[in-house]
Amino acid sequence: MPEAAVVKIPPDFPLEKAALLGCGVITGVGAVVNAAKVKMGSSVAVFGCGGIGLNAVQGARMVGALKIIAVDIAPQKLEYAQQMGATHLVNAAQADPIAAIKDLTGGRGVDYAFEAISLTKTIEQAYAATRKMGTCVVIGVTRADVQVQINANEMVYAEKTLMGSLYGSSRPKIDILNLIEMHQSGKLLLDELLTRTYPLEEINTAYAALERGEVARSLVLT
């Protein structure tokens, strides 16, 4: 492994928790803090409540967003989102998420929307749920052939911002240490993220549980 890819952490910080920081946490929290720069008192919608989306939810909580709307089709994932700080839950299998978000925001849409699923439909929904002069951030990495259709006039007249965020637009050597301090001060939730641990011989069971949406995050230990 290249030296540039290694971050030195405090020797007493549990490796199980450190493993969570290196992808989902830094990507989700970073998209909120570094990329969108969500302001205190804002309204936020997060489409997709997997490992990255859950951390976008808690990133929004950490910066003081007042209304945090979590969108998913899996009830268990929505429950995890509530634990991370979501104030409202929308099951997209039962309701139109755009209409639900507009209803929750007095018809305006949210100040910031985050898409963490990597689907054309949900990227377009997140953009549509963003208010005038709001910001929509795509966090999920799609297939190379995925295309998104956005009405150009709407982008101009509504002055919306559509942007991407890779790895939370982060500086890992700085941000991972900051995240450790945030956890130690009680601001960043990690214990609540780690739903289960598995021995290496049960790795297929771990993947199956992840695909079914039964876990927020899980670790395979060797």
What residue ranges belong to the model's regions?
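Mid-domain Rossmann-like dinucleotide-binding core that forms the NAD(H)/NADP(H) cofactor-binding site
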Residues: 4-5, 10-95, 99
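C-terminal hydrophobic helical "lid"/dimerization subdomain
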Residues: 124-128, 169, 173-222
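A general structural signal for well-ordered alpha-helical segments in protein cores
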Residues: 6, 25, 98, 110, ...
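Rossmann-like dinucleotide-binding domain for NAD(H)/NADP(H)
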Residues: 155, 162-163, 178-183
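Glycine-rich cofactor phosphate-binding loops and adjacent beta1-alpha1 units
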Residues: 36-40, 73-75, 79-161
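Structural detector of well-ordered beta-strand residues that form the stable sheet scaffold
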Residues: 7, 45, 69, 135-137, ...
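Short strand-turn motif at the edge of the Rossmann-like AdoMet-binding core
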Residues: 2, 117, 140-143, 166-168, ...
